[in-house]
From Swiss-Prot:
Function: Serine/threonine-protein kinase that acts on both serine and threonine residues and promotes apoptosis in response to stress stimuli and caspase activation. Mediates oxidative-stress-induced cell death by modulating phosphorylation of JNK1-JNK2 (MAPK8 and MAPK9), p38 (MAPK11, MAPK12, MAPK13 and MAPK14) during oxidative stress. Plays a role in a staurosporine-induced caspase-independent apoptotic pathway by regulating the nuclear translocation of AIFM1 and ENDOG and the DNase activity associated with ENDOG. Phosphorylates STK38L on 'Thr-442' and stimulates its kinase activity.
Swiss-Prot/TrEMBL catalytic activity: L-seryl-[protein] + ATP = O-phospho-L-seryl-[protein] + ADP + H(+); L-threonyl-[protein] + ATP = O-phospho-L-threonyl-[protein] + ADP + H(+)
Chain positions with Phosphothreonine modification: 18, 190
Biological process, per Gene Ontology: cellular response to oxidative stress; cellular response to starvation; execution phase of apoptosis; intracellular signal transduction; intrinsic apoptotic signaling pathway in response to oxidative stress; negative regulation of cell migration; protein autophosphorylation; protein phosphorylation
The protein's name in its UniProt record: Serine/threonine-protein kinase 24
Organism: Homo sapiens (Human)
Origin organism lineage: Eukaryota, Metazoa, Chordata, Craniata, Vertebrata
Length: 443
């Protein structure tokens, strides 16, 4: 067996005795190809491809996420985290997890099949009305109320991570960066999420709690109303500076006062002033506008008609390549702002989640980790210290220097190793510049 598969089996065996599994279990011996019939590909989830499937024992339709551990070596901890959180959840508002199976280097994760698409998909044919927005937000709030009561934080709430069944049921999905709080650890301070939806305190890496999900919900409310989050036209790195520094986004346009007030309540820069999910369920926008979830089937039908027309117009397009788990999706990649920043070095997670000490150190050597750039300590930090010293001496602007330094470190968080690449490219360009006589023309 491949070393990565061995590592996976070791970690799960270590954990299995302590983990509660309301929704499923992990089986390292059964052959998933005998237990399940894999049908058409329906999307791309976090870490792997998602297929529609049949449980041969019950004839139940399921979603099968298949991950090649050889190709997902950098994401093993995140995959384990997603399974850990899902296996601990038992709520009609959270995607159900039925079990995991390991076959050679392929991990099969069996989940609830949700054929209605994601909330992001439903935006593709056109805008939603406020009744539809309120109904979706109410169901997200029910999911968040459940998670927060279990001391869990989703940390990546956005329309792409909200899935619907064909009957209009709304469920939270994609728990690859979800966090667990305990009685002794009431806040977290790791930098994860998707930039446009991230709360200011998360970006600043301050201590944060479930109120970070409420901020993301407010951004999602704007996304559902306008089709995209605020600042979606900007580079994500720029947005990471704007969110903590600027006033909170507001919902502009021809929307009702209650919806605008709902968004404003969620997007308070001070986390303690944001309402809880339970309190937001009583907000007048929700109470006045939300209907039964069956009302959303009209949206799902609209999306399916739109998708069929798109396929007919462009038969060469591969509409099955979506980005969420278990959805019958139409490839709703609305731009570069969808990506999620995942935790690089998970802290000691509680309640049976993987601890660093649980892993065989020798086997861990088989999984190369992308290191942070060496130039951060050898070049970048000393350089900025020198710049700040010189700037102070002549009364310069220290804030701009700190912003530039922060941008480099945020880029490194998102893409470890990028600073070394940048410095190497700069050196090459400087060498070419000097060889060409300082860039002056010879004619």
């Amino acid at each position: 067996m491949d070393s990565r598969a061995q590592l996976w089996g070791l970690a799960l065996n270590k954990r299995r005795a302590t983990l509660p599994h309301p929704g499923g279990s992990t089986n390292l011996k059964a052959d998933p190809e005998e237990l399940f019939t894999k049908l058409e590909k329906i999307g791309k989830g976090s870490f792997g491809e998602v297929f529609k499937g049949i449980d041969n024992r019950t004839q139940k339709v399921v979603a099968i996420k298949i991950i090649d551990l050889e190709e997902a070596e950098d994401e093993i901890e995140d995959i384990q985290q997603e399974i850990t959180v899902l296996s601990q959840c038992d709520s009609p508002y959270v995607t159900k997890y039925y079990g995991s199976y390991l076959k050679d280097t392929k991990l099969w994760i069996i989940m609830e099949y949700l054929g209605g698409g994601s909330a992001l998909d439903l935006l593709e044919p056109g805008p939603l009305d406020e009744t539809q927005i309120a109904t979706i937000l109410r169901e997200i709030l029910k999911g968040l109320d459940y998670l927060h009561s279990e001391k869990k934080i989703h940390r990546d709430i956005k329309a792409a991570n909200v899935l619907l069944s064909e009957h209009g049921e709304v469920k939270l999905a994609d728990f690859g960066v979800a966090g667990q709080l305990t009685d002794t650890q009431i806040k977290r301070n790791t930098f994860v999420g998707t930039p446009f939806w991230m709360a200011p305190e998360v970006i600043k890496q301050s201590a944060y709690d479930s109120k970070a999900d409420i901020w993301s919900l407010g951004i999602t409310a704007i996304e559902l109303a306008r089709g995209e989050p605020p600042h979606s036209e900007l580079h994500p790195m720029k947005v990471l500076f704007l969110i903590p520094k600027n006033n909170p986004p507001t919902l502009e346009g021809n929307y009702s006062k209650p919806l605008k007030e709902f968004v404003e309540a969620c997007l308070n820069k001070e986390p303690s002033f944001r309402p809880t999910a339970k309190e937001l369920l009583k907000h007048k926008f929700i109470l006045r506008n939300a209907k039964k979830t069956s009302y959303l089937t009209e949206l799902i039908d609209r999306y399916k008609r739109w998708k069929a027309e798109q396929s007919h117009d462009d038969s060469s397009s591969e509409d099955s390549d979506a980005e969420t788990d278990g959805q019958a999706s139409g490839g709703s990649d609305s731009g570069d702002w969808i990506f999620t920043i995942r935790e690089k070095d998970p802290k000691n997670l509680e309640n049976g989640a993987l601890q660093p000490s649980d892993l065989d150190r020798n086997k861990m050597k088989d999984i190369p980790k992308r290191p942070f750039s060496q130039c951060l300590s050898t070049i970048i930090s000393p350089l900025f210290a020198e710049l700040k010293e010189k700037s102070q001496a002549c009364g310069g602007n220290l804030g701009s220097i700190e912003e530039l330094r922060g941008a480099i470190y945020l880029a490194e968080e998102a893409c470890p190793g990028i600073s070394d690449t940048m410095v190497a490219q700069l050196v090459q360009r400087l060498q070419r510049y000097s060889l060409s006589g300082g860039g002056t023309s010879s004619h």
